[in-house]
Structures are given as C-alpha cells and as structure tokens.
C-alpha cells in the first residue's frame, strides 16, 4: 500500500470494526483503482505538500475507498440512496402502471380531434367492398324461401356480398307494396336475428328491415382442424386473428352494413336509410353512420365506449387507440342532427323459425377466417413494398431512410407515453456477496406512479478501466434472480442456466431488469390499448431511464452495451433495441419467428389463437413490421438469433425462413458478418454458447 493510502488506512482504524473491515477489504479488492487515485507518492513527496493539501488528499482517498466498499456489496451503490422497499417489486410496478393509466386518460381526452377517417382506420373498415351488391335468397332447396308472412310484409333469409369471399347473412323484412324507407337493425350479439321481436315494429311502420347476423359473444368458434381449442366466443376468436392484420370484428360488421346501404341506394337512391342497434350492435351502428353520411338517422342510445375501466370489458371491444381519438360525446357530435328514433308502429310479434342457424354461423365465421387468412398470406408482400422504398445502399443511408418508418412503428404499433419528466431518484440495496460477483437491487423512478426495477451484477474483482455491460431480460413470469445463484435442480436453472453469472465471469457488468409481464398483468394491456399504448410503451421508457443511469456509473463503458433476451425477453429484444441505439449488439433467444403466422394461424398448435396471451396482439403489425423488419431496424448493429430445435414456440422451418430475410438484408448492405443464427439441440431455454462468443466479439474485440 502506498504512503497516501496508508494514511487513509490510519483513519480507517478509528472507525468501527465492521466499517474498518469494509474499507480495508475494498482497498485490497481494487488495488489498481486505489493506487491510481492515491498516486504513488513517496514520503518526501508528501512532505512537500501543505497540511491542507494532505488532508484533502486523504479525504479523496477515503471517498474513493468508500465507493469501492459499496462496489464490494457492503452498502448502496455510489450516487444512490439506500433502498428500503419491502414487498414484491413486480406487483408494485404493475399496480403503479395501472394508476398511471387512469391518470393520463383525461390528458388524452382533452387533446382529441375526432376524424371519421381515423375511426375507419381504428376499426379496420378499409377494404374495398364487392360491387355491385346482389341480394340472394339463402336456404336449402327443400325449404320455402319465405320464413313467415304478415299482412303487409314477408320475412326472407338472404345473403349479400361484402368483401372478397365474405357474404353477409340475415333476415330481410320486405314490404309487399314497396317500402317507405330502410331500417338496418343490429341486435345484441348474444341473439340470433330470428330472436328479435322488436323488428316487427319497424316493419309495421312501413319500412323494409334488414337484420344482419353478427359475430356471437356467446357461441364458440368452429373447431380448429387439429382439434385445438380455447374457451372463447366467435367475437374474441375473430378479434385475435384480425387485430394483427389491422382489422376488427366491429369493422367487419360495419362493412356488412355499408354493403347493405350500397345495395339499397342502387335500388332506391332517393329513399332514406336508418340504422338502430343494441349492445355491441349499437357500436357497429354508430360507427357505420359516422363513416357513411348516406345513413340519415341513427338510433343507438348510450354506447358506453368510455367505461369506468377498460380492464373489465370483453376483449372483443378492444379497439386500439379508440379512447385517444374518440369519446362518447365525440361520436355523438359527429352524428349531429342524425341522432333520433326510427319510426315504429304497434305490431304483433311472430315466431320466425330458426333454420340451419348452426350451419349459417359456421359458414359466416369460416368466410371471415379465410378472408383474414388471405390478408395474412399477402401481408409479407405488403411489408416488402413498404420497406423496399426506404432501403439504403449503405448503413448510414439506411439509418436516415428508415427514420420515418421507425417513428411510425413507435407511435402507431407500440405506442409512446406522453412526455413527462420525473427525477429517477436512484436507490440501491446490496445483495448477499457471492464468490464471483457482487450485486445490488436497483430502483429508478420513471413516472410518479411507477418505477424501473432491476439487479446489477459486477465481477467480485472489478478490473481496471471501464467494462462492457450486458442487459439480460427474463421471460414471461420471470424474475431477475432467475438468472443467477440458482441450484442445478431448479426450474429457473433449467431455463436460464445462471447465464448472468457466465457473463460476469467474463469480467462484464450485467443488468437484469424486472419487466412488467409477471403475475396478474394482462389487464394493463386492456387499459393501455384504447389509449394507443402497449406494454412496450412502459418497458421502453423503463429501459431509457435505466440506461441513462447505468451509463453514469464510473466502471460502465457506455460504448459497449449489449442485450440478450429469452422468450418474452426475446420479444423485448425486437421492441427496445431497434429504437435504442445505445445497444451495440443484440441477441434474440427463444422467440424469433414467422410472427404473423404465430399470431393468426388457425392450423398450428403453437399459435396464439389457442392461448390466453392476448398481450401478444399488436395492431396492424402484419402490414408494417414483423420480426424480420424489426430486426432490420437494429442494423447496422450486430444481431443474433438463438434457437433450440425443440423449442415449442414454433418450428425451425418458420424461424429459418424469417431469418433468411434478415440475413439477405445484412448481406445486401455489405455487413453479413454482423448477423447469424445459433441453432442448438435443445428446448426453450438459454444455450448461450454461441451468444457468448457473439457478445465477446462485438463488445470486447477491437
């Protein structure tokens, strides 16, 4: 120990035994830092210094040793306050995000600028309808076309073309002597058209009446080809398939209505169209009227599109961004003087026979499935055309060209939180020492209601200079602690294989964020989607705050930060690093896939169509950016996929096919050596062998 440090040690001797042990241990554990900061002054050098300067140097040395004592795990990290949080940080994080979402709802409401074209996009009513519309009788050849007759009208089962391969079906109450006007009635979605006696009141007042079949909120969808099933209604089934394609059950029903208006105006251009609805049918009725001024009168009552909380609403009412652009009063304002009550007259309800209802529903849902399936199959070409227009011939040109599309993905697909400044107030708490590393729990404030939480690990003997940092992200229901200190017989070890310890042994720092997808969290997605936000809106902001703080630490090299994420952490790899340039190399493990197929396939058992995980849904992803395109946004930075042959998230053929598009992109840019795929013979877990070489190459080698 140099003389300067010896004087510091003398002062240490006056401290308590525990403090003395901490400080001396720190001085011994980090000799290169201590020597550099104390200097190698001789006794004669020190004698030439004034007493004041000597005292100052001793104070500096003491502060340095105290800092290194904290790096030995004995106290909070330098520059942080002690962390005294008790309880489950993941649960507290989820609860805080929920409170934040409730707080910002009025912020969005105050900034609405209702636009019918925006509503059209939000519900996905954007496809060209079939022209001309030809009304057909529907039913078996051995059954009469007329279901029931009254004195002045008859009831027919009909169908009409709507979209490519999709027909609307329902009842047509046709006046014998010609109609005065048309009423389109959309009932609650737990009823068949034949179970709506109120329709006779419209017909008794002289109207022709259409009652379209709507997707059911009580009937299950038809069985999948392989027999896989999940307990859900037709409406939820279609929502899950339509949402990533930029479509929605309500939008498809609106298209049915507008096709009826098309037919009516072909036949009776001067006669009025009126629309009425109940329950979910009222949503479609009101939205159709907003989009089509040919509808002269709207009867819906209160829609309830601004419930006290979205978390308890059915999933099939999930319209991405609706509350951001429209409230109840905004819809009513757009309808203005068209709100009213459709004419009625006293009528005796008649029983309409319910013929072939199951076959009708099967036909209707299958047609929608086929329509959405075609959109999914064509979506790659749509993305190719979109991205072909911005590809550059060099990495620098690519980054400039990709900026507008990158912004579109952030704002329209993933969602961005409203700007707000909150001091991070870093707090830390040491973990029990381990042979190879020291660690701290870290808490950083992101917004007043919620925080970022993680674990920082550093080598027990911190090398001289700044060291690389690797952020390692856990998967669904995971915790940072799953990645280190686990016994070989534990489930966490089987999945994560103490990968954080492997990285620390390389002499690197490792940060392990706690992401929100733990415990009961999915209601946050239900609350966020109407505001045009997703879980990644929060995760990305938590990452921003964490990286801002991490790069201030004196031992972290901010130019050498890497990312490794498994499973849901692999999803994070494609939704945070593409928009965060401080990550210099990225590994996506156990998730990279032909993502559109993974989301919407009704024929593969690993599809999210058959799981509870509706948090996977991202609006219109299929036509904007799937996994290959998100990986392209990482370029020109290095990108690696890690994939086990027996990983149940998909099959090699899907993963390799999607990755081929990434490899081609890197090759065409002349940086093919910066990407690859690491295949191993194993299940859904960390492998790490090739990933470690990849990170070492791009974070440590010149």
Describe each model-derived feature in a short phrase.
Residues 1-10, 34:
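Residue-level detector of structural "landmarks"
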Residues 259-326, 330-336, 548-620:
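Primarily recognizes the serine-hydrolase "nucleophile elbow" in alpha/beta-hydrolase
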Residues 75-168, 175-178, 194, 237-253, ...:
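Alpha/beta-hydrolase-fold serine-hydrolase catalytic core, especially in secreted/extracellular enzymes
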């Amino acid at each position: 120990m140099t003389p300067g440090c010896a004087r510091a040690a003398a002062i240490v001797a006056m401290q308590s035994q525990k403090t003395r042990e901490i400080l001396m241990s720190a001085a011994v554990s980090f000799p290169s830092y201590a020597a550099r900061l104390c200097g190698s002054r001789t006794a004669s050098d020190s004698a030439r210094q004034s007493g004041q300067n000597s005292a100052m140097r001793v104070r500096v040395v003491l502060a340095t040793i105290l800092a290194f004592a904290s790096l030995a795990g004995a106290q909070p990290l330098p520059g942080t306050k002690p962390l005294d949080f008790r309880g489950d940080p993941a649960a507290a994080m989820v609860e805080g995000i929920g409170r934040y979402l409730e707080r910002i709802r009025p912020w969005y409401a105050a900034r609405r600028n209702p636009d019918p074209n925006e509503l059209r996009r939000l519900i996905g009513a954007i496809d060209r309808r079939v022209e001309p519309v030809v009304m057909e009788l529907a039913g078996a050849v051995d059954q009469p076309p007329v279901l029931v007759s009254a004195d002045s009208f008859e009831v027919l089962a009909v169908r009409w073309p709507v979209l490519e391969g999709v027909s609307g079906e329902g009842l047509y109450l046709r006046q014998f002597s010609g109609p005065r006007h048309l009423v389109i009635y959309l009932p609650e979605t737990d009823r068949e058209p034949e179970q709506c006696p109120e329709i006779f009141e419209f017909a008794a007042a002289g109207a022709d009446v259409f009652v379209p079949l709507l997707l059911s909120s009580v009937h299950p969808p038809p069985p999948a080809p392989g027999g896989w099933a999940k307990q859900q209604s037709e409406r939820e089934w279609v929502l899950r398939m339509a949402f990533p394609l930029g479509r929605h059950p309500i939008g498809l029903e609106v298209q049915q209505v507008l096709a009826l208006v098309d037919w009516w105006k072909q036949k009776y251009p001067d006669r009025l169209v009126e629309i009425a609805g109940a329950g979910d049918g009222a949503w479609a009725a009101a939205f159709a009227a907003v989009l089509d001024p040919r509808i002269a009168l709207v009867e819906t009552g209160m829609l309830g599109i601004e419930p006290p909380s979205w978390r308890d609403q059915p999933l099939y009412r999930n319209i991405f961004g609706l509350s951001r652009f429209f409230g109840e009063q905004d819809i009513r304002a757009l309808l203005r003087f068209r709100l009213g009550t459709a004419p009625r007259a006293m009528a005796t309800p008649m029983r309409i026979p319910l013929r072939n209802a199951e076959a009708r529903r099967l036909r209707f849902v299958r047609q929608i499935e086929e329509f959405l399936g075609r959109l999914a199959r064509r979506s790659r070409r749509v993305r190719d055309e979109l991205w072909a227009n911005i590809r550059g011939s060099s990495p620098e040109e690519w980054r400039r060209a990709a900026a507008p599309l990158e912004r579109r993905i952030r704002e329209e697909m993933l969602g961005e939180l409203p700007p707000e400044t909150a001091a991070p107030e870093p707090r830390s708490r040491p973990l029990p020492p381990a042979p190879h590393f020291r660690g701290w729990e870290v808490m950083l404030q992101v917004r007043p209601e919620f925080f970022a939480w993680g674990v920082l690990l550093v080598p027990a003997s911190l090398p001289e200079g700044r060291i690389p940092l690797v952020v390692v992200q856990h998967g669904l229901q995971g915790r940072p602690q799953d990645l280190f200190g686990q016994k070989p017989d534990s489930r966490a070890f089987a999945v994560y294989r103490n990968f954080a310890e492997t990285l620390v042994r390389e002499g690197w720092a490792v940060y392990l964020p706690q992401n929100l997808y733990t415990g009961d969290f999915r209601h946050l997605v239900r609350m966020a989607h109407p505001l045009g936000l997703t879980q990644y809106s929060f995760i990305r902001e938590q990452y921003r705050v964490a990286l801002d703080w991490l790069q201030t630490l004196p031992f972290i090299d901010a130019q050498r930060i890497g990312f490794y994420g498994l499973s849901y952490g692999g999803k994070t790899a494609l939704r945070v690093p593409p928009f965060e340039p401080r990550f210099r190399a990225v590994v996506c493990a156990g998730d990279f896939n032909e993502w559109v197929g993974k989301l919407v396939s009704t024929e593969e058992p690993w599809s999210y169509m058959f799981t509870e995980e509706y948090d996977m849904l991202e609006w219109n992803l299929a036509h904007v950016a799937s996994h290959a395109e998100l990986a392209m946004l990482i370029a020109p930075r290095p990108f690696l996929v890690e994939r086990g042959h027996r990983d149940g998230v998909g099959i090699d053929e899907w993963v390799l096919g999607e990755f081929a598009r990434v490899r081609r992109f890197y090759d065409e840019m002349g940086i093919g050596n910066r990407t690859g795929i690491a295949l191993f013979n194993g299940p859904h877990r960390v492998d790490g062998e090739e990933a470690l070489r990849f990170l070492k190459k791009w974070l440590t080698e010149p």
